[in-house]
């Protein structure tokens, strides 16, 4: 299967040179019909390179969700790995930056104040053990965009590959009052998500 597409092939191998003897191989590749992928489905396989676009859920031009070979989700356009940014190792930092999360479907929430960091919403690192089968609400900070994130898998334990899969479905979330601004705990004050940019040269934020 070609990730991010509906293209599948049957690959019948004819030869494979082993024992470091040259790396030769041969096969016949035949187009095939594979399973339909639900709209909004995304999967990063274990040990897949998180820096590659096909292993990032590019929600928008500047929101790219992925995960390294361990730890939690992060935002690949602004973060090179999960960012604690001073947060406790078990309760976590603001990653993935630019997003905030709440437990359960978006329709369950009537106030933006119920949203938290990803690890804050799932109950810390230990909470990720039970992500498969659970639905969380994700809000894109600074917008009225909400999504229901239904997790199908989430590889646990350190150095086991960092794989995960979910279906992301647009949802209607709580209205945000005009002029409302909030910086999450441990949000990086150098990022625009955590600055109230009142004018081109007046940006209000706060350090940790």
Predicted ranges, named:
Residues 17, 142-143:
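Short loop/turn positions at the edges of beta-strands in beta-sheet-rich folds
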Residues 27, 146-147, 154, 166:
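Aromatic side chains
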Residues 1-2, 136-140:
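Short conserved beta-strand and strand-loop elements enriched in small hydrophobics
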Residues 1, 18, 24-132, 160, ...:
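N-terminal "domain-start" segment
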Residues 12-14, 137-139, 150-152:
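Residues within well-ordered beta-strands of beta-sheet-rich folds
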Residues 14-21, 152-161:
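Short, exposed beta-strand-loop hairpins at the edges of beta-sheets
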Residues 5-10, 143-148:
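Short coil-to-beta-strand transition motifs
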Residues 9, 23, 162:
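Residue-level signal for beta-strand positions within conserved beta-sheet cores that form or flank
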């Amino acid at each position: 299967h070609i990730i991010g597409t509906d293209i599948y092939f049957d690959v019948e191998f004819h030869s494979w040179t082993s024992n470091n003897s040259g790396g030769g191989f041969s096969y016949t590749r035949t187009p095939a019909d594979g399973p339909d992928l639900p709209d909004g489905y995304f999967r990063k396989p274990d040990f897949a390179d998180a820096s590659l676009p096909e292993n990032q859920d590019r929600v928008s031009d500047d929101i790219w969700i992925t995960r390294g070979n361990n730890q939690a989700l992060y935002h690949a356009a602004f973060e090179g790995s999960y960012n604690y940014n001073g947060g406790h190792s078990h309760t976590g930092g603001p990653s993935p930056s630019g997003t905030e999360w709440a437990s359960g479907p978006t329709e369950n929430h009537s106030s933006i104040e119920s949203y938290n960091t990803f690890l804050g919403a799932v109950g810390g690192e230990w909470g990720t053990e039970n992500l498969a089968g659970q639905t969380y609400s994700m809000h894109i900070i600074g917008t009225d965009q909400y999504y229901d994130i239904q997790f199908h898998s989430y590889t646990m334990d350190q150095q086991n590959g960092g794989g995960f899969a979910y279906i992301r479905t647009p949802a209607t979330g709580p209205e945000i009052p005009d002029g409302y601004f909030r910086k999450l705990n441990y949000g990086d004050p150098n990022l625009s998500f955590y600055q109230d940019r009142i004018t081109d040269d007046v940006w209000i934020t706060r350090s940790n």
